[in-house]
A protein has these predicted regions:
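Extended non-globular scaffold/tether segments
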Residues: 152-163
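Conserved catalytic cores of very large enzyme subunits
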Residues: 1-154, 176-727
Length: 727
């Protein structure tokens, strides 16, 4: 029969605790013990080479850090936090002033995924043995001393994790959680054999990485429904697990992902300094992504009974893990309804279209087999399942390039001879020069990698390894792919500006380029009539031929430019991709950007990710989705379409089964991604006035969730500026 301790376990207290900590954990709560032990480790390893500093330093921390256990824990692993005393706060401030959040030899920065499949296949013990065998071989053959030291450090990291797991078993035993202790002892010395052991192994590594090793870890946790399904089926067949117990373990895993977080929002609120911050809590506001569903390398949908359990147990008020569901035209209908239900209740979930993303990855240079294994890491960046490194993300700001060209044209006297085709030609040449220069600089840095091996030892280098362990860093080419990403930022602002040039300047001749340039220079002061013409011009998101045509034309320019970039000749496979991502730069860059031809005044926010500009969706949600679906995406592999929907509309649409059909139609028409905030303007404004009543109000920012009331007033106002998009 299924494990009695799991059958009898309640899960309500776990959820209650996680929600309480998300809402009420003091903002100055600090992982102070971690800071103390890291400072001790820094002194102990001062004279060692970096790989040994990393190995022995992590050993010191993991051998001594406390492992809190609560009676309701199903998975073991927490980090101690406290509000520092006056003395503790002084120590914290002095230590951070001296070494930062971590010492220089700890250099993990997250924004990546691991080879979770290899961890689950070999376990910590197998990975250690693999590295030890390679180390022994290099010693026998008198290999490079730097490589030997690198491997010695890697072996120490695996040993540190295994010993930490044993210590966690001791803590569980002392707390009377004997089944959990047995699970931990098993994975300390063997590869995981059961569903619980596999999930516990994932959590041990995630916990250490996200709270001790990496600053802003932003880790993707892999395709756990696919990776864990055999463990689940075997346990079901042997009678040691049932569906309910698996759901409890998954729910506790979700809870654990939330209790380690700090308070606040890191992109806009963090600028105001009124939240936890990365120094107090390395995990703070990092989104950890968990991937479900999608196609496998054979083109078959991986939706299974475990996918359903993972989706069913999502807690709508949690921030993490941020679920990435991969839609395909074979997606299980019942699972699809559940996914859309979670999307509609405001859960931390986003959906990608496998057919679009996989095709873009293949066009960018990823093999079809590897493209099918793609994952996203926060915020909305593509990766090849723990097998890629992203040394470059360049933000191509076409809307500011348009402003630069208007200035150039006004000064060179060519405005009278231009038409929209000639303007596009100049825009393409201008962007091409910038992109080529940035790519050449990045590629030259990557070309130097082999000469500087083995590089800096990090925890990620121990878990982004395939079957063949390579004794050098991820940032020196130990993974199979190097991805160069060229982002189109503020897409709609650029499209809407080009529409004004085409329709009002070149076609209808409502005003000249010179008139427009003077109006922009003066921030439209004295030119309100001209501004209103710009504001009322067609806008991207209205699904009309003019704006959709300019969307295609702009994206095609970007495609042509980056398709010519030569990523060959690297130590691994070079890949060039595009993305429609902005993070929260639409606010920050908007504050720095002059007035734009779409009628936007200086300082106002620019458009966000793949979304239309604020106030432009006058033709409703369906038109907005169809505009987004029609934009070409041949090499666009990621990007967030943030949609804010009225709660009443969504609830009624769910009752009538309209919402799942609407989202499916969007994807089947070529849509790439969607993420939703389900609220109303009245609710947002009420939350500003009475935050204590709305602590559960979660909103989507760019590829992560935030508690609306914990955002700064500046960030809240920027969010409210997004209009509701309803049918």
């Amino acid at each position: 029969m299924a494990n009695p301790s799991l059958k009898n376990a309640g899960i309500g207290k776990n959820i209650e605790e996680a929600l309480h900590l998300l809402r009420f954990k003091p903002a100055n709560s600090t992982t102070l013990e971690r800071v103390r032990l890291t400072a001790q480790a820094d002194r102990l390893v001062e004279a060692l080479p970096q790989p040994l500093q990393m190995g022995r330093g992590l050993q010191h921390i993991l051998d001594n850090i406390s492992i809190p256990v609560e009676p309701h824990d199903l998975l073991i692993g927490r980090i101690s936090e406290e509000v520092p005393s006056l003395e503790g706060e002084k120590f914290f401030q002095d230590t951070v002033a001296h070494m930062g959040a971590r010492p220089p030899w700890m250099d993990d920065w997250g924004h990546e995924g691991f080879r979770w499949d290899i961890l689950l296949q070999k376990g910590f013990v197998g990975l250690e043995a693999q590295a030890q065998a390679l180390l022994d071989n290099h010693r026998r053959e008198c290999g490079c001393e730097d490589t030997i030291i690198y491997l010695e450090g890697a072996v120490l990291i695996y040993q540190a994790l295994r010993n930490y797991t044993r210590r966690a078993a001791e803590a569980a035993t002392k707390a009377g959680l004997h089944d959990a202790a047995k699970c931990l002892l098993a994975i300390a010395d063997n590869p995981p054999k059961t569903f619980r052991q596999a999930l516990q192994a994932v959590w041990i590594l995630e916990l250490v990485y996200c709270t001790i090793a990496a600053l802003n870890p932003t880790l993707t946790l892999g395709r756990l429904d696919m990776l864990l399904i055999d463990f689940y089926k075997n346990d079901i067949a042997s009678g040691i697990l049932d569906e309910e117990s698996a759901g409890k373990l998954i729910t506790d895993f979700y809870c654990k992902n939330n209790i380690i977080m700090g308070r606040g929002e890191h992109q806009l609120s963090y600028v105001d300094g009124a939240d936890t911050g990365w120094e107090r809590n390395l995990c703070y506001d990092s989104p950890q992504y968990l991937t479900l569903g999608g196609l496998d390398a054979s083109g078959n949908c991986v939706d299974n009974e475990l996918t359903a359990i993972f989706v069913r147990n999502i807690v709508s008020r949690f921030k993490n893990p941020f679920i990435v569901y991969r839609y395909c035209n074979q997606s299980d209908p019942e699972i699809w309804k559940m996914v859309c239900g979670k999307l509609a209740d405001g859960s931390s979930i986003l959906i990608y279209n496998d057919h679009i993303v996989i095709n873009a990855l293949i066009n960018g240079g990823v093999s079809p087999e590897d493209a099918a294994q793609y994952e996203m890491f926060g915020c909305n960046w593509p990766s090849v399942s723990g097998n890629s490194v992203n040394p470059m993300v360049f933000h191509t700001t076409y809307v500011t390039y348009i402003l630069d060209l208007l200035k150039e044209i006004s000064e060179d006297g060519t405005a009278h001879s231009l038409d929209i085709d000639m303007f596009y030609e100049r825009l393409e040449n201008y962007a091409c020069n910038i992109i080529n220069k940035e790519f050449d600089k990045a590629k030259n840095r990557v070309l130097e990698w082999p000469a500087t091996r083995p590089g800096v030892l990090k925890v990620d280098g121990c878990f982004m390894q395939g079957q063949e362990w390579k004794p050098y860093a991820v940032g020196r080419g130990s993974v199979d792919y190097t991805i160069f990403t060229f982002v189109i930022t503020h897409l709609a602002s650029a499209i809407d500006s080009l529409v004004v040039l085409d329709k009002l300047v070149f076609t209808e001749k409502k005003f000249s380029l010179g008139d427009l340039y003077l109006a922009l220079k003066s921030n439209f002061e004295g030119h309100e009539h001209l501004r209103q013409l710009c504001v009322n011009a067609p806008k991207y998101g209205q699904d009309d031929d003019l704006t959709n045509g300019h969307a295609k034309r702009l994206v095609d320019i970007h495609h042509r430019i980056i398709a010519k970039l030569d990523a060959s000749g690297l130590c691994n496979k070079g890949v060039v991709l595009a993305s429609l991502e902005t993070d929260s730069a639409n606010v920050q860059r908007g504050e720095e950007t002059a007035a734009t031809p779409d009628g936007r005044i200086k300082g106002a926010q620019l458009s966000h990710c793949a979304s239309p500009s604020w106030g432009s969706c006058i033709n409703g949600l369906t038109a907005m989705l169809m505009s987004a679906a029609k934009a070409p995406k041949d090499i666009i592999a990621s990007g967030g379409l943030n949609v804010q929907l009225n709660k009443g509309f969504v609830q009624e649409a769910l009752k009538r089964d309209i919402f799942p059909q609407l989202v499916k139609a969007y994807f089947d028409s070529g849509g790439m991604q969607i993420q939703c905030t389900i609220t109303s303007l009245d609710e947002l404004r009420a939350a500003q006035l009475d935050p204590d009543k709305y602590r559960d109000l979660m909103v989507r920012i760019t590829g992560y969730s935030a508690s609306f009331v914990e955002m700064s007033k500046r960030a809240q106002d920027a969010f409210i500026a997004r209009e509701e998009m309803i049918l």
